[in-house]
């Protein structure tokens, strides 16, 4: 008889989120990629310690890499602890890597990590966005639209 799933893995658990990326970039497409991590990195992520605010992804030699993501050293780690800002390999299919590479080279887009989370099976994943940078004018328009939607929702809520 199959063993029931533990309750901790019923849904995904977000570890780090890059909220600024949604403001600075216009997100065109999203991808889910696995990350090749060392043991102490997984333990540090499970402890909820990570920052992807200044990180980005790039394709080098047919492989995708997460650059400048900060996963601090594990507090109970020994001399074999990991480097906090080392490049981490992203696990994607070759078709996905070729598609990302084509978009980045031809259309001038950027690969931005939106979040790091554990999926229902307990595997660490990165949500990558294929995005285009916003100019200052675009950001102002985005803020106006967001404020109008918020005001509209407030008006509808107060009337009903």
From Swiss-Prot:
PANTHER family: SSRA-BINDING PROTEIN, TMRNA-BINDING COMPONENT OF TRANS-TRANSLATION TAGGING COMPLEX. It is found in: Cytoplasm. GO terms for molecular function: RNA binding. GO terms for cellular component: cytosol. This is SsrA-binding protein. CDD domains: SmpB. SUPFAM superfamilies: Small protein B (SmpB). Belongs to the SmpB family. HAMAP family: SmpB (MF_00023). The keyword RNA-binding applies. Gene3D superfamilies: 2.40.280.10. Required for rescue of stalled ribosomes mediated by trans-translation. Binds to transfer-messenger RNA (tmRNA), required for stable association of tmRNA with ribosomes. tmRNA and SmpB together mimic tRNA shape, replacing the anticodon stem-loop with SmpB. tmRNA is encoded by the ssrA gene; the 2 termini fold to resemble tRNA(Ala) and it encodes a 'tag peptide', a short internal open reading frame. During trans-translation Ala-aminoacylated tmRNA acts like a tRNA, entering the A-site of stalled ribosomes, displacing the stalled mRNA. Pfam families: SmpB (PF01668). Keywords: Cytoplasm, RNA-binding. GO terms for biological process: trans-translation.
